Amino acid sequence: METNFEDSKSLDEPVLHDIAIALLKNDYWSLYLSPEQKRKYISILNDTLLWNRFINVIEWDKLCDEKDSNGSNDDEEDDLDITTLFRCRCMIFDAKINPALFDLSSTSSGSIEHVDHQNISLEASLAEEEERKKGDAKKSEATGRQLFDDDDFDESDAEDSSKATITLDLQKDKSLRKSIIDLKSVDIDDMDTSGFAAIESNKALSNISFNYVYYTLENDSENINEVKKFEDEEDTSTPNTSSFQNNSSSLDLSDNLSLNSKFGSLTSSFKYLLQYLEGNRSKINATDADVKQLLSDVKKNKSKWANDQRIGQEELYEAAEKVVLELRSYTEHSLAFLTKVSKRDAPDYYTVIKEPMDLGTILRNLKNLHYNSKKEFVHDLMLIWSNCFLYNSHPDHPLRVHAQFMKDKSLELINLIPDIVIQSRKDYDDSLIEAELESDEESTAETSKHVTSKKTSSRGGQTQQAVEVHTDANSPEENNTPVTKKEVETSKPPAVSGSTPPVNEAAVIESSNTLEKEPLSDVATEYWKIKTKDIRESHILNNRRILKSLQFIETELPMIRKPTAMSAFIDREVAYGSIDCLPMDKGDFEPIMKLDTTPLLEYDVGSGVPMTAGSVLETESEEDLYFRDYSLFEINRNTPGVPSLMYKNIAKMQEIRKLCNKIQTVRQLQLPQPFYYEHHKSHVPFANNEPILLDIPQNYDNMSSFKPLAHDVLKKLCTIILFHAGFESFQMGALDALTEIAADYMAKMGAVMDQYLIYGKDKSQQEIVGQTLGELGVDDVNDLISYVYHDVERQSVKLLEIHQRLQRHFVELLRPALSERNDEEAIFNQNGESFVTGNFSYETGDDFFGLRELGLDRELGLDSLSVPLHLLQSRLRSNMSWQPEATIKGDQEYAPPPKYPPITAESISNEIGLIQGFLKKNLEEFGLDELLEDEDIRPRSKPPRPRLPPNGKITTGRKRIASSVFLNQSLRKKRCLKENEQGTEVTTLPEE
């Protein structure tokens, strides 16, 4: 098609056409277009009608269809598409709206000649030049944010073109405005078609625009495997960066191939491990190389079949032995095949069967290293079943059923044996050398065969030479060259005998075609993929963590937007709008907003959706700071509310326990038995000053679950409740059980309240809380108030009263109880205790009480022994305790009642007649003038313990001899003998 812009009047936007040419000449096209899209862009610039329809957006869909059906097109690569038209138009309008982003001053030298348009006069051009200079001066002082509006891309207004400032210098000489440069003379292949080379060399690298379109997220599938690897490494804390790089080229365990077919040489030893891996293939994120490495690590170093001189023997024989032992273990069917057939059982067996075989013989052949390949082993194994079928030819013979079962089982187990031919060390080394030489020769011949050719670009006709596999990646025609199977086989390295599996030729051909046929995407998309890779991976990680615990609701009422609920979205929008497109210093082209922090709107699917009810605290900004200060949530005795009261009650309980221990200690001193202090140790005081510190990690925003942290806090709160209930100590198992019960109760409460918040939006917060507590067993909120009042607040008053009573009782115990009763304790004053306890004998070296002779000093580990004073005091105390209560003086609130009159002989007549006889009898029996009351009678004292003699030996009373039986027998014998002497009959003694 002829191109003539000389007389063209159809160009509505001549300035845009000049900008388009300047972008092409200054290599700014590489920021938006790929090399293929560049060729289409040139065809649009060279065609007047095409340019007019392109710039005015006139039936683009029909335009693409016409280009596809036009037979005059020599190349399919020049077929227009909507994506190319959109990116070309976007590039032109970006340069028009923000000329500061593009340095097009080089076009003023005359490399691009301006078009002489009849509707633009020289005076208008000069006026526009002056306006352009003024606009440039203003734009150099201000910086703004690059805005992308759909209206800017679709409207071409004459008023906008008059106001737009263009850096192109208008040529004052009309003679220079003849025609546009012939773009056919531009050699496209000589230009930088890589796209990124121009980007790296250009100062406008940081100003590549890629946020003006929405990108689909299918490219994230490339990062899924890397994200899974990262999650596994995050759990195990063992990073493996090399697996990220090789993950795209490795096969996943989710393939349809079974593990037994992939690792046949290793599966015989790890049957159960592979069964587990096979059953959990969807949960295990590991490549085939990882599984093979795992099996190699678990496998023991060397087996009994290892032999360095016979390559492949260890793997072959180990697998074969496993198969034989597995077959022998099926005793239900294998009993007839374990040993040779006896001639006694089958006399004609060896006549019919010329080559007998059994499992025992195969096992002996393995021990004798009889087999050199899998084929030989399988032959002997199948010979067992064929011999059985041959000898037992009757179809209903029972052994045929067993043989068929064993044959099927052996065919299943044979797949686990690697196809290996055992070689000697010398033959194996020779084969490696030959294979290496052959691979070098074939690679040299293949390299000389593949020659690339350069394609010439022309509009009239293009010639193209046949190209082999290795071609330039920039040429789409060359990329479509198929790869033959012969070439793949030629480039394949020679196989070495062993367990190495053969190369899948179809997979190689398919992967080669896929790589070569994959077209290059546009520069902006590639730039977006590279620069947003890290942030996209972080988005995927966060989304996967959230989805683990997220529950979707099928039916949901519409959300009501409120200022507090939309605050997060508004703050983010304001923060994004405050970022300038260019830095303050125009000479420095480093952007303020880095690409790592670029917001991806594709992932922000809920940017305009308010948060759910209950998730936003409707408070003022000053109060928001309160909830961000984690130190305010430390729970200790100074915390206001119920926890502080509980801490105070617990502290008061500890003081009461200490006081009880002191009282118990004083009472133990009054007892005669020994007292051991370690049996009554005081309780460890409760750490009431230790706060609950929330150990919030630094990366708490990326934590998948706060369950461990919440569990620890709840356990501490349960501990406080148990101490407040009166428990002195408890087992950790009981505490964990109580914590789990409380956690389950709180989780149910949250779930019920969440349902009410979602479906009960017409109810108030008080009603929601009341109904939630009612479903969980709390009938009324007043029950909670009663618990706080009676069990927490009033308990502090009760504990204070108990502490005061115990304090008074302890003071009374410490007073000298016998100071006003008797002065006999004066004998123990002035160091008189040493004469009583025996301490004076320690200085003289005598053992006064014989305690050292008894070995008590060695037994108790004491240097000096003495009788405890409380033994003597207890006896004295018992002697003095008979005194009536009347002698004890004390302050009493009320006077005691008067005593009853004593009963005498004269007063008996005043009593009732029923007891007069009893009273007279007691008076006569005791010979008393009056009867004593029971409380006036001195208590009967127990007999005193025997004292130790001076020698220190403890003696016991003589034991009584039960001689009555023997005495009676001797007396009866004497009587019988006496009667015998007197002539009476002798009788035998009766046996008892």
From Swiss-Prot:
Localization per record: Nucleus
Listed name of the protein: SAGA complex subunit Spt7
Alphabetically ordered keywords of this record: Bromodomain, Nucleus, Phosphoprotein, Transcription, Transcription regulation
GO cellular component: chromatin; nucleus; pericentric heterochromatin; SAGA complex
Lineage: Eukaryota, Fungi, Dikarya, Ascomycota, Taphrinomycotina
Modified residues annotated as Phosphoserine in this record: S475
Bias (Polar residues): 459-483
InterPro entries xref list: Bromodomain (IPR001487), Bromodomain-like_sf (IPR036427), Bromodomain_CS (IPR018359), BTP (IPR006565), Histone-fold (IPR009072), Spt7 (IPR037782)
Known function: Essential scaffold subunit of the transcription coactivator SAGA complex. SAGA acts as a general cofactor required for essentially all RNA polymerase II transcription. At the promoters, SAGA is required for transcription pre-initiation complex (PIC) recruitment. It influences RNA polymerase II transcriptional activity through different activities such as TBP interaction (via core/TAF module) and promoter selectivity, interaction with transcription activators (via Tra1/SPT module), and chromatin modification through histone acetylation (via HAT module) and deubiquitination (via DUB module).
